[in-house]
Each structure stands twice: as C-alpha cells, then as structure tokens.
C-alpha cells in the first residue's frame, strides 16, 4: 500500500554525520494504527506497512511486530521503536495502537497504558488530552484515510500506548512538564535524526565551516527547525548558510570563532534563531541546552520581566510556568510583550557575543512553537 507519488525513505542511508536514523514514536504509533485498521476494516494481516511522512515526497516502511484482535472488538497492533544511533530513552520500546469503531464519524485520540496525559498548559496539546503531538495526530488521520481509500468513515477511536511506558517516562522530561502516566508520542518529520552524540558535534563543526566557506556577510544557527523559514525570508540566507546546531550552542559559537580565526575572516552578523525554551538557558550560562543537562530558565526570564516593570502577579506566573511556551501564552496579550521578548533576545545575544569576537554582531530572534515572531523579528518581518 505505497502512498501515491511518494518515494520510500531509506533508513539504511546514514545521516550526514554518518549516524543511523530512526523512527519517531509518532511514526511507530501511525504504523500500528494503520496495521490495526487494515485488520479491522479489510481483514488483512500484514507484517509491514508504509507510513506517509510529513514530507509529501516520502513514505517509510515500518515492520509490524504483532496484530491481535481483542475481545472488545478492537484490534491491537504493536511496533518496536527504533531510534538508530540517537540516545533515545524509548529505543526498543513496544508502541501499540488499539483501534475500534466509534460510529461517531470522527477520529478520536486516547491514551492507552504507557502514554501520558497532559495536565498543565504550555505544551502543544491542551490539558486533559493524551500526550500525542499534532504532527503524529495528522499522520494517523492520513493513515485512516489511506486505509478507507475514499470509503465512508464510521469514526475510529485510536488508543495509543507503550509497554512499560510509565517507567520509561521517568527518564524523560515528562514528569517536569506535567505529563503523567507515560511517554509522549512525538515527531515533526517522522524520522529520528541522531543529534545528541559527540559525533553530531563533529558534524556541526563541518557544517559551520561550510557555511563560512565563501566568507558570507551572515550565517544563521538554529537549534531545531524553528527559525529556518525566517532565515530564508526576510534574511535571504541560503540553505548552506543555515546550520542546525541542536543543543550545542556554546560549542557551535566556538566552532565559528575558530574557523573565522583560521581563515582570517570576519563575519558581519551571526543570527541565532529559535525557540526561547532552549535559547533563554544562555541567560543562566548554560551552553549545552539538552534537558538532561539543564533545567528551564524561568528564574532569569522572570527577573527580566520584573526589571521591565511587568506586573508582580504576572512575574509570579512566569516563575512557576510549566514551560517557556507557557510564558509566551501568559504574555501574549500584554501590551509590552514584544518589548519584553526583544529585551530577552538582546540579553541572550550579549552573552553570546564574547564567544565570537570575529563576528561584528550576534543577533538573536525568538519564535513561538508555531513560528510566530516574539520580539524584534516581528518588527523586521513586518517591515
């Protein structure tokens, strides 16, 4: 059942850093949903399915470990999580889906044992919902459509679980985020890119040198995908000039400085573009922003708010916020929100600048999870 016009994504081809890619929990859950649906709707038992990835050009074949009809009339399918060379706590875990007809004409998502439930604001899923992020939900809806192939949709309940997920979740950031009962079903591309090993740091150095190779006026660093669109427009940077640095902010700044020194060049502007959840940690002197090595920067963010005269009640909310995304929500309707985030940007840049003296300017731009500019970027984008 290969989705039309999609090419198979080959996990055997290593990432640019030479490491093996893997399948996200979102892809595993989608594969389990599709296999269970094929048994439930068509009576087919399969040993693998093809999952449509968010990139419309690709699909991914995923092995199915088990398919089992349940006494309730639902069908359960299991998939083994494969993380490649990424140090993922869920590697090897059994992700499963229990799929049943609900006769409500809609797809409903539920947390089976081992998948958590969101209890606090500030995440991409509202409180009370299973911890299944938006992109995996969309992938599962697409799998439903593919199995039905244009036929009537009676509605399905998709209960997603993880064997031993509650124990696995204790080794993740979920307890601090207020996600209770298990792991989260995550992923934005469907593919695990191995980003957290020392080997990935070595590859970042290569990418930094390539970005600086033609002595450009500017390059950009992004911890993740947030900020890439801004790098393309309005900054007009080429893909080669944009380096994804993962959690390794300090090392990446040092790589840039070393390359500029060796080439005896100067850089006009080093842009650092991303979500404040990672970048604000620099205010605390944190240069490796992985959650296992650092907490959230609520204290520093709240201190800036207090200095700028933000109401004391709001400052207290910031101090106790669940995530920095929650802080964005707290401040989004306040008249001084853009000025506040611009100040945060400037302070982060001031901490970074001494590590790259051969850059004339380090400029930080912050964005919400949906890509909305928070500070000065909003002024520039609207100019």
UniProtKB/Swiss-Prot annotation:
Name the chain's protein.
Cobalt-precorrin-5B C(1)-methyltransferase
Record-linked PANTHER family: COBALT-PRECORRIN-5B C(1)-METHYLTRANSFERASE
Work out whether the entry's keyword set contains Transmembrane helix: no
Task: Tell me the Gene3D superfamilies matching this sequence.
Answer: CbiD-like (3.30.2110.10)
InterPro entries assigned: CbiD, CbiD_sf
Which biological processes are named by the entry's GO terms?
anaerobic cobalamin biosynthetic process; methylation
Q: Which keywords accompany this UniProt record?
A: Cobalamin biosynthesis, Methyltransferase, Plasmid, S-adenosyl-L-methionine, Transferase
Provide the residue span(s) of the region labelled Disordered.
1-24
Keyword set includes Heme = no
Pfam families from the UniProt entry: CbiD
Which species expresses this protein natively? Ralstonia nicotianae (strain ATCC BAA-1114 / GMI1000) (Ralstonia solanacearum)
Taxonomic lineage of the native organism? Bacteria, Pseudomonadati, Pseudomonadota, Betaproteobacteria, Burkholderiales
Q: Which reaction does it catalyse?
A: Co-precorrin-5B + S-adenosyl-L-methionine = Co-precorrin-6A + S-adenosyl-L-homocysteine
Entry GO MF terms: cobalt-precorrin-5B C1-methyltransferase activity
Stored SUPFAM superfamilies: CbiD-like
Its UniProt pathway annotation is: Cofactor biosynthesis; adenosylcobalamin biosynthesis; cob(II)yrinate a,c-diamide from sirohydrochlorin (anaerobic route): step 6/10
Q: What is its EC number?
A: 2.1.1.195
The UniProt family comment states: Belongs to the CbiD family.
């Amino acid at each position: 059942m290969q989705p039309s016009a999609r090419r198979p994504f080959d996990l055997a081809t290593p990432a640019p850093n030479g490491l093996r890619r893997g399948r996200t929990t979102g892809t595993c859950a989608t594969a389990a949903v599709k296999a269970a649906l094929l048994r439930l709707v068509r009576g087919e038992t399969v040993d693998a399915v093809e999952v449509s990835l968010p990139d419309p050009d690709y699909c991914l074949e995923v092995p199915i470990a088990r398919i089992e009809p349940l006494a309730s009339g639902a069908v359960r399918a299991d998939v083994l999580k494969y993380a490649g060379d990424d140090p993922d706590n869920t590697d090897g875990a059994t992700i499963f889906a229990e799929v049943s007809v609900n006769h409500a004409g809609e797809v409903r998502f539920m947390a089976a044992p081992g998948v958590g439930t969101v209890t606090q604001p500030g995440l991409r899923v509202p409180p009370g919902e299973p911890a299944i992020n938006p992109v995996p939900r969309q992938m599962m809806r697409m799998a439903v459509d593919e199995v039905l192939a244009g036929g009537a949709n009676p509605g399905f309940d998709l209960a997603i679980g993880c064997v031993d997920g509650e124990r696995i979740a204790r080794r993740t950031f979920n307890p601090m985020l207020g996600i209770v009962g298990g792991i989260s079903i995550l992923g934005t591309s469907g593919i695990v890119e191995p980003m957290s090993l020392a080997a990935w740091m070595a590859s970042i150095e290569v990418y930094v040198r390539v970005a600086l190779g033609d002595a450009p006026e500017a390059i950009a660093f992004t911890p993740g995908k947030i900020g890439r669109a801004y790098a393309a427009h309005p900054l007009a940077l080429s893909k080669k000039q944009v380096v994804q640095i993962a959690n390794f902010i300090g090392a990446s700044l040092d790589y840039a400085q070393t390359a500029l020194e060796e080439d005896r060049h100067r850089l006009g502007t080093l842009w650092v573009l991303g979500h404040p959840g990672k970048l604000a940690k620099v205010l605390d002197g944190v240069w490796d922003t992985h959650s296992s090595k650092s907490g959230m920067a609520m204290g520093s963010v709240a201190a800036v708010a207090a200095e700028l005269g933000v109401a004391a009640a709001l400052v207290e909310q910031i101090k106790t916020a669940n995530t920095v995304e929650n802080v964005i929500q707290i401040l989004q309707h306040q008249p001084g929100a853009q000025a506040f985030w611009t100040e945060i940007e400037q302070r982060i840049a001031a901490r970074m600048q001494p590590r790259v003296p051969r850059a004339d300017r380090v400029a930080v731009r912050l964005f919400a999870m949906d890509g909305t500019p928070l500070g000065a970027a909003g002024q520039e984008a609207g100019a």
